[in-house]
Amino acid sequence: MEKRPEDTRVVVGMSGGVDSSVAALLLKEQGYDVIGIFMKNWDDTDENGFCTATEDYEDVIRVCNQIGIPYYAVNFEKQYYEKVFQYFLDEYKAGRTPNPDVLCNKEIKFKAFLEHALSLGADYLATGHYARVDRSGGKVRMLRGIDENKDQTYFLNQLTEDTLSKVMFPIGELQKSRVREIAKEAELATATKKDSTGICFIGERNFKTFLSQYLPAQPGDMMTMDGEVKGRHDGLMYYTIGQRHGLGIGGSGEPWFAVGKDLEKNILYVDQGFHNPLLYSDKITATNISWVRSDIMKGEEISCTAKFRYRQEDHKVTVRMTGEGEAEVIFDEQVRAVTPGQAVVFYDGEECLGGGTIDDVYKDGTKLWYV
């Protein structure tokens, strides 16, 4: 039998933003025994000694005092550096475009932090993610958030039913606009705070400047597949397949896009046209395949839909397992700018089935020059 809310301890991961603030407020109003915990994963003190984490923690303190719940901070900087940031650098070094948020959720928020919460006697860990957990029928399923524009299951694709059985997403049933309203009605300190964007450890800083501190850039030629040099690139790691901005190629005609990379020769391939055939593929291989429920992949393959980047429409695909955690994903129709290193995430209607990491990209049986 389930415990009553007042006998159920929920640790809320609080970032200092409006979403996690409202998540904590709703749980408190529902009668749960709530503790707010701020996670520090990165030392982001800038050259002027300003640290956004300090400001965020102060907002957490204000909100927790308003709601009337205890709070404190935990530090996962070491784990984050080893498990997430090192991977981020290695992927860029390999010419790929990683998604650190997926790994942060898998290794830090819903592993290291979840273990910490359970050690405090918590029954559940709650976060301000826009996603839902369905516990009906004796199964644990992850569903998209009600707000389609904010749904974050893409970044949560590596979570399993075991983890999700201990997780709550209190705002997953709400529209973002309603979350803001609730915060304003309760006069929470974070009610009008703007949403954070971008990668957490880069913050508002320039991406190129940040990356160059860790990886020396190697400029090289930008050329067409026919070998016509169109300019110089600043370093392959700064460009992603399908990128238009920052190429600096002038002239008439359609805009230019990054359509391929040659890591060995340090060449960035470019061509004109948003719908350039070089940007389209029909199959990928994927690694790190993880299914939310153990009963999803019963046979060799399943038909479902997939997203190859956040906020992209769903595409019909067939997923064929080829080894432990490895799969071939065949598209019903060609898809534009599928990028190695990014997440591929599988869906069946509202349900997020799981996902993996895009490895190689193919078209008509030929591997494309995407890394």
Swiss-Prot record:
It is found in: Cytoplasm. InterPro entries: MnmA-like, MnmA-like_C, MnmA-like_central, MnmA-like_central_sf, Rossmann-like_a/b/a_fold. It comes from the Bacteria. The active site is at C104, C200. Its EC number is 2.8.1.13. It holds the Pfam family tRNA_Me_trans. The record marks H129, Q342 as: Interaction with tRNA. ATP binds at G13, M14, S15, G16, G17, V18, D19, S20, M39, G128. GO terms for molecular function: ATP binding; tRNA binding; tRNA-uridine 2-sulfurtransferase activity. Residues 150-152, 309-310 are annotated as: Interaction with tRNA. It catalyses: S-sulfanyl-L-cysteinyl-[protein] + uridine(34) in tRNA + AH2 + ATP = 2-thiouridine(34) in tRNA + L-cysteinyl-[protein] + A + AMP + diphosphate + H(+). Keywords: ATP-binding, Cytoplasm, Disulfide bond, Nucleotide-binding, RNA-binding, Transferase, tRNA processing, tRNA-binding. GO terms for cellular component: cytoplasm. Disulfide bonds join C104-C200. Residues 99-101 are annotated as: Interaction with target base in tRNA. One of its GO terms (biological process) is tRNA wobble position uridine thiolation. HAMAP family: tRNA_thiouridyl_MnmA (MF_00144). Belongs to the MnmA/TRMU family. Catalyzes the 2-thiolation of uridine at the wobble position (U34) of tRNA, leading to the formation of s(2)U34. PANTHER family: MITOCHONDRIAL TRNA-SPECIFIC 2-THIOURIDYLASE 1, TRNA 5-METHYLAMINOMETHYL-2-THIOURIDYLATE -METHYLTRANSFERASE. This is tRNA-specific 2-thiouridylase MnmA. The gene is mnmA.
